[in-house]
């Protein structure tokens, strides 16, 4: 029993906690944050800015594509952020301007209808 207790004391005294360098931890954190910034935040911000420019450039008569799959011509742009799209003759829908994905070149709808 005495041998067992002395063995436990020897094991306790022989284990040392390695001291870690706090600078390496900070460096790794900065590396991960910079990778996260350049891989996620920056591209997302560019995408949002590009979409905002698209929304601001909308005008009457533009042919647009929405995220819900509608293709139509802008009939009216309201001040509240909604757009009235003409999908077909006498078929109009209200769409939130944030859901406009792209603007087609003029005459695209005529080409699509003739197909």
Swiss-Prot record:
**Where's it found, cell-wise?**
Cell inner membrane
Alphabetically list the UniProt keywords: Cell inner membrane, Cell membrane, Membrane, Protein transport, Translocation, Transmembrane, Transmembrane helix, Transport
Q: What is its main location?
A: membrane
Q: Does the keyword Lipoprotein apply?
A: no
Entry's InterPro entries? Preprotein_translocase_YajC
Identify the domain of life. Bacteria
Recorded protein name is Sec translocon accessory complex subunit YajC
Q: What is the organism lineage in this UniProt record?
A: Bacteria, Pseudomonadati, Pseudomonadota, Gammaproteobacteria, Enterobacterales
């Amino acid at each position: 029993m005495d041998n067992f207790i002395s063995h436990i004391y020897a094991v306790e005294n022989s284990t040392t906690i390695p001291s870690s360098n706090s600078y390496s931890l900070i460096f790794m954190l900065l590396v991960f944050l910079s990778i996260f910034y350049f891989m996620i935040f920056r591209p997302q911000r560019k995408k949002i800015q590009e979409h905002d420019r698209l929304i601001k450039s909308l005008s009457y008569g533009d042919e647009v594509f929405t995220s819900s799959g509608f293709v139509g011509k802008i009939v009216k742009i309201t001040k509240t952020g909604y757009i009235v799209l003409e999908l077909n003759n006498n078929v109009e829908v209200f769409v939130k301007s944030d859901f406009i994905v792209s603007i087609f070149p003029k005459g695209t709808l005529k080409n699509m209808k003739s197909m």
